[in-house]
């Protein structure tokens, strides 16, 4: 289940370091934690930003990994 997906940031709370992504393929929203963002420095995402990511099964449901802002 780790194929590369594209989607949009639904929301991201930079104070708490997490949010959700909407998948372009119509799948369920995916949890994203700041540690999954593949960038240097302060890791955050903006609402509406396009991203690519992989989907993994986490302890509480789907979660994103290797998130790259487009």
From Swiss-Prot:
Source species: Shewanella violacea (strain JCM 10179 / CIP 106290 / LMG 19151 / DSS12)
Record keywords: Activator, Cytoplasm, DNA-binding, Stress response, Transcription, Transcription regulation
Gene3D superfamilies recorded: 6.20.370.130, Nucleic acid-binding proteins
Record-level Gene Ontology MF annotations: DNA binding
Entry's induction text: By cold shock.
An annotated GO cellular component: cytosol
Record bears the keyword Ion transport: no
Disulfide bond sites: none
Boundaries of every CSD domain copy: 7-67
Protein name: Cold shock-like protein CspA
InterPro entries registered for this protein in UniProt: Cold_shock_CspA, Cold_shock_domain, CSD, CSD_CS, CSP_DNA-bd, NA-bd_OB-fold
Subcellular location as annotated: Cytoplasm
One protein family per Pfam: CSD
